[in-house]
């Protein structure tokens, strides 16, 4: 843990953050939902959620969304069916939260599409759904889009390796979003030449030792790497080898557990600012 840059560029109280971010064109808040994933992304006035944490951390996610005044998003991406990524989805929609579209990877380990939790949520709450495959592009306003990189093949035994991997490119900068991708999916994407450089990396699989290989980190060369985890839930995260690989790639590192609300990334015309956001 001593390799992590704990003194981020700025630590703010939430109300001040809302004011200070008003001019930013692209921002991503990686929310502290313990050892789970949930990120709120805003680009060109459009808002997206990437994962919804687990049901036990839904209250924190809802509190953050309410504080932002976010009652609807243009899309919710669920990277895979692990409960710490999709667990909050159904209760979030049941609460009246609105989404224009739900997205999930077409390759998954559920017995059928009808058994997929995102499909079930789509049917129950009347939200349209799109299955995503490598090569698909989801526009996000002028000059911006999410490009789906993986998964390239179905891993029937390890749902993490069916994780939706996306590259968000905007005029302000880029983010690589990786779900819980482990080393086998990393290897597939590296072999296919699909791993891009990115300004910001959402570190795969909570910084565990079965992901973020050295070649992957050196290929992405992120300026900042964001790890979504909690050492109470998972004491071995972030793994020292993962931190070493990211450090060798010259990435600064932030961990969601080090902020009450989460880690805010602001991309603004090539400039990059990272802030730890706390409640009052």
Regions found by a protein language model. Name each.
Residues 8-17:
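Bacterial N-terminal signal peptides
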Residues 2-4, 21-280:
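Non-globular, low-confidence helical/coil segments that flank catalytic cores
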């Amino acid at each position: 843990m001593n390799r992590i840059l704990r003194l981020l560029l700025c630590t703010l109280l939430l109300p001040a953050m809302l004011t200070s971010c008003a001019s930013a064109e692209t921002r991503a808040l990686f929310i502290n939902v313990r050892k789970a994933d949930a990120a709120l992304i805003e680009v060109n006035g459009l808002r997206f959620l990437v994962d919804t944490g687990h049901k036990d951390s839904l209250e924190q996610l809802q509190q953050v969304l309410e504080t932002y005044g976010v009652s609807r998003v243009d899309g919710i991406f669920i990277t895979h069916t692990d409960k710490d990524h999709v667990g909050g989805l159904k209760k979030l929609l049941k609460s009246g939260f609105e989404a224009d579209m739900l997205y999930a990877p077409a390759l998954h380990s559920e017995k059928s599409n009808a058994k997929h939790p995102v499909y079930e949520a789509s049917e129950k709450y009347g939200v349209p759904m799109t299955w995503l495959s490598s090569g698909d592009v989801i526009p996000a306003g002028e000059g911006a889009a999410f490009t789906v990189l993986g998964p390239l093949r179905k891993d029937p035994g390890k749902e993490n390796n069916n994780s939706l991997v996306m590259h968000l490119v905007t005029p302000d900068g880029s983010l690589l979003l990786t779900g819980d991708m482990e080393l086998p999916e990393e290897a597939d994407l590296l072999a296919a030449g699909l791993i891009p450089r990115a300004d910001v990396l959402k570190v795969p699989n909570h910084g565990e030792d079965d992901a973020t290989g050295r070649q992957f980190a050196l290929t992405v060369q992120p300026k900042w790497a964001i790890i979504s985890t909690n050492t109470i839930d998972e004491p071995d995260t972030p793994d020292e080898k993962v931190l070493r690989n990211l450090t060798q790639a010259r990435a600064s590192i932030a961990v969601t557990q080090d902020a009450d609300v989460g880690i805010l990334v602001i991309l603004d015309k090539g400039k990059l600012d990272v802030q730890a956001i706390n409640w009052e």
